[in-house]
Amino acid sequence: MTIKSSYGDTYRSSVYNSWKKDGTARQGYYGDGDCTGCWFFGTAFSELKGKTITKVEITITRNSGGSSSAVGLVVKSHGHSGRPSGAPSYRTTAGTLSLATGETDTLPITNSTILSEISSGKVKGFGIQSTYDSSHYAVCSGSVTVKITYTE
């Protein structure tokens, strides 16, 4: 099963304490606050409730912004179907995907906690959150694809 994000957004704490609403997901810090990125999928993950999830693969594209060299995107699961009113909260770290600007790559997720939390309905999306500094700053496309392998 393949799911595409409905949209991506960035919550900026420490300066604006609000969502950027420009269609990108960002991490790190680059003058406009501590950036935490999210991809939202609406209720798409609810179709997987009760299934045995064996593998998840998320494909991410890094846009221009910040250093052009590779930055480690720290991918985490979250339980929000859409943009919350305040800062997002994350559940479990899925892994790190290193991308330079203009690159697209796929992170395989086999963390048993995340797989079981997708099945139980607790995980509804993914995001990126790393150290809040310029060396970890990255801007990603709001459009990501999640491929999920499961059995009934």
Task: Tell where the protein language model's regions lie, with residue ranges.
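A short beta-strand element within beta-rich, extracytoplasmic domains
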Residues: 43-46, 50-65
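Hydrophobic beta-strand residues in large extracellular and virion-surface proteins
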Residues: 3, 53-60, 71-75, 107, ...
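Short, surface-exposed beta-strand/strand-loop-strand elements in extracellular ectodomains
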Residues: 68-83
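Hydrophobic alpha-helical elements and their junctions with loops/disorder across both membrane
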Residues: 63, 84-86
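Cysteine-clustered segments with highest specificity for TGF-beta superfamily mature ligands
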Residues: 86-152
